[in-house]
From Swiss-Prot:
Signal peptide: none
PROSITE patterns membership: DNA_MISMATCH_REPAIR_1
Gene: mutL
Keyword set includes DNA damage: yes
Family (UniProt): Belongs to the DNA mismatch repair MutL/HexB family.
Native source species: Buchnera aphidicola subsp. Acyrthosiphon pisum (strain Tuc7)
Xref: PANTHER family: DNA MISMATCH REPAIR PROTEIN MLH, PMS, MUTL (PTHR10073), DNA MISMATCH REPAIR PROTEIN MLH1 (PTHR10073:SF12)
Record Pfam families: DNA_mis_repair, HATPase_c_3, MutL_C
Protein name per Swiss-Prot or TrEMBL: DNA mismatch repair protein MutL
GO cellular component: mismatch repair complex
Function per UniProt: This protein is involved in the repair of mismatches in DNA. It is required for dam-dependent methyl-directed DNA mismatch repair. May act as a 'molecular matchmaker', a protein that promotes the formation of a stable complex between two or more DNA-binding proteins in an ATP-dependent manner without itself being part of a final effector complex.
Amino acid sequence: MPIRILPSDLSSQISAGEIIERPASVVKEIIENSIDAGSKNINIIVENSGFQSIILKDDGCGIDKKDLLLAVCHHATSKINSLSDLDKLTTFGFRGEALASIRAVSRLTLISCTRFNDVAAKIYLEGFCSKNIILQPIAHPEGTTIIVDNLFYNIPVRLKFLKNKKLEFSKICEVVKKIALSHFYINFSLKHNNKLITQYNSINNRKNKINRLKDIFDTLDTSEFLEIKEKKYRMVLFGWISHPYNFKKIKNIQYCYVNNRYLYNNIFVNAVRAAYSKIEQKKNISFVLYLTIESFNIDINIHPTKNEIKFHNPDVVYTFIYEAVFSYLKKIKEKYYFNFSCKKQTQLNKEKEFYFYDSDPTFLTLISSIFFKKKQIFKNIKNKIKHNNFISKSTPLEKYESSIGRLLIIIHKYYGLIYHDNNFLLLSFPVAKGIVRKQKLKNNIQKENIIEYFLSNIKINLTSQEYLILFNQKEILSKFGFHLIFKKKYVILSSIPAFLKKCNFHIIISNFFAFLFLKKQVFISDIVDWFYINVFIELKNWTYIRGIEVLLEIEYYCPLLLINPPSKLLQKININAALCILKI
């Protein structure tokens, strides 16, 4: 068969198939068009799950009658004029494909009126085969009415795959729900076969936004959710997350929005789950979160239905979401455990017997020499930065220059090439991170800011000498989050530092106590060094973003270190000597 150009009606049906998959796709596209038109009231009327007809009425700005025919053509849009406009998008639509795709697979009626028109205009089209399209005058208020009849009438194969009408209508309801969740100031109503299914009234007060959740999830108790709002890294995160210590079974509600556009994104989900895992292990985590980010930092034009986007700096986005959620969860945890500690301890779980070991010195020497090796776990370094003023809002992260200098490139995975005062320096990231970790741990201890992980009471049998060593060290251990209750011949361990939670902490605790018994007397610096060697993970692949974050952390946590940095941290590269050798 020779190569030939497809007829316009066939090519239109093929391209429409990428955008209009089912009736819910039509509803999504026309609602988004109405929102772009500034509508305050959007009414959707569906017959026979959308296969017979879908009608949308809005009170937006409307389409001028001279543009009505153009609006249903391919690549016709008022949203962008040039390629550079893609970096400034604030609207849902921009391709000019929605109405053209709907037209290709249905019988479409379009009625619209602007405030500048004396009378509305109406057109009727059947696919792209329509000829001699007549623009008819008609009475209509300002706004637009779209009537989509007999969807897929000209593609019977598609109808065979969409037999479950109940399922298709549930998809329509889900689309309306998702859009209503991000547009609080719009009234939405949905009717099916002349029956009102849902109606969401507009909410004009920010404090009452959670009422939209009540309307959409009618069985939801909103007291189970916490409102969060955070602004950082030129981004804003707003929304609700489920209470970490609410043990009722609630729906697994997970909705993510970027610039009011719904999407399911792994960065959101993973960041939220990581934050919860630091506080409380929960299977059912619910959240409705809205991320506002500058348009040039995302790419929307990567999927036909625009259900996916690409972040230009995903690590920064992940860190921001993680930090925001974790900070709120941490506050709740502190409040929860303060109230919990005031109650009688009769509600604690039954004590678990954990017999430590015999006092054989050979065994103590052996166990203290064993280091528990953990698998490398991805940790985003930015969740350690706690202050907004690290980076100026006007300075891009990649161009930020710290007191050490500006990071140019990563060399051999572990080292960074730094430029400062016409000099080139080589920085060891593992050494830098180790210094920062130790300093941060010391700072948290001094400020009594160590997060504790509460255990079911663990009973540890000890010899009299071991008991005495722990008793003498109880104050310094409590600063690290080890809460010990001393009985006559044994101790009860009720909490450990939260950073041990994901470790096999029984082994870690055994090794740590063996270390204490051998040393007999320890200082804060000794314990910090022990945790750094035995617990903390060393990154094996340093990225540019993580490198910058280490520079920022050194500048903030260890400013005096920059006056006289150790040789293992920073080495000057003699460029002049190399130039003299290479000079012709």
